[in-house]
């Protein structure tokens, strides 16, 4: 994951949280590969609730929820991704804009599909 902008210090607690969140993402991916989607969802949802500042848990959850037809959940996660990633200090402004644009496009496509 990209570092913070120059001059912004990360606290020890923030570092520990980031490491725990990253470990949960890896556990979530392993759970998905093993076919345990409920465990994967729980791990990703915790990171979403904590505002993990990278796209992996949001993208994985949206994919799972869309496959299940749980479009309300997919929309909720997309909106949270846009909120968290737009405010993240862990990426450059250009990276933030690009990532947020991807999630906004996914949200628009989901909403169009729902109206469809």
Regions found by a protein language model. Name each.
Residues 7-23:
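TPR-adjacent "capping" and linker segments in tetratricopeptide-repeat scaffold/adaptor proteins
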Residues 20, 27, 60-61, 107:
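Structural register within alpha-helical repeat arrays
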